[in-house]
Amino acid sequence: MAYYLKEPSIPTQEPERTGILVMNLGTPEAPTAKALRPYLRQFLSDRRVIELPRPLWWFILNGVILVLRPRQSAHKYATIWDKEGPPLMVNSQKQARLLEGYLHEAISSPYAVELGMRYGSPSIASALGKLKAKNCNRILLFPLYPQYAASSSASALDEAMRTLIRTRNMPEIRTIRDYHDHPAYIHAVAKSIRLYWQQHGKPEKLVMSFHGVPRRTYDLGDPYYDQCQTSGKLVAQALGLEEDQYMIAFQSRFGTAEWLQPYFAPSIQALGKQKLRRVDVVCPGFSSDCLETLEEIAMEGKSLFLEGGGGEYHYIPALNDNDTWIKAMREIALDNLQGWVTRR
């Protein structure tokens, strides 16, 4: 089998296009232990995610985690799975499709948008293949992670590059590293919160929860923590909040090592013990609702807050297919497509 991939057959009249590859984490095929096992194996075998020595991690992964965790995770996925499928997949597909339509209003040159998932299907490799088949000789890689982390943004870019280095006719490549302080992104998050408050009233405190990563990665130079702090402060400023009206926390800790703090779970429980009448939680680092927002934050977080003695607990949905967010995606993409496309 040849190492370099065969180029797709493209009709001579097919125009050259600019491709946008929208990338997100991915999801299992079904909320079952059988479907979770290969998904978790791929996810937890990623060196960007787990940096332990491979022989040690192989025994932990195959001897413990893949024996116990699939069944546990399947139960959690079942609580958020709907008729259309997993929310992350459904929303990501809508985002890619809507972005393609919204770009038509802004650019006149030929282009195409595809969705690729880092783990599971549709894979990043298959999405790149579709863009190549559409005669895309320039491709913008757009990971839907506002804040850069090696375990998310870099992992998605790694996977794209692994496919591209096997490409015989290499396209021009640009990457969106992050957009943590992009005005359109901050505006979209702040507006979604503001609209929620217009319908449901305001809380005593807003908690902005970001996905956690091991503290060690920060010590080694990963900018994720600083970018989360910047995003949170910019959103708070856009909402006109004082420092005592909001807090930033980190969720989804995995394992026993120290992760970025403050941890979400003990923080939300402590707010409950303070007898706050109402707390709202939003997850600015997630472009789409998923297991971590709908189960961990909306369900588990609520239980912790109420058990602590708190009053009302509100989860503010992720940006999903929000019109303001799709327009923000367009602006972020256009900023990185300069010189490649013709604006209307």
From Swiss-Prot:
One of its GO terms (cellular component) is cytoplasm. Pathway: Porphyrin-containing compound metabolism; protoheme biosynthesis; protoheme from protoporphyrin-IX: step 1/1. Its EC number is 4.98.1.1. GO terms for molecular function: ferrochelatase activity; metal ion binding. Fe cation binds at residues 211, 292. It is an enzyme of class 4 (lyase). InterPro entries: Ferrochelatase, Ferrochelatase_AS, Ferrochelatase_C, Ferrochelatase_N. SUPFAM superfamilies: Chelatase. Gene3D superfamilies: 3.40.50.1400. It comes from the Bacteria. Keywords: Cytoplasm, Heme biosynthesis, Iron, Lyase, Metal-binding, Porphyrin biosynthesis. Belongs to the ferrochelatase family. Catalyzes the ferrous insertion into protoporphyrin IX. This is Ferrochelatase.
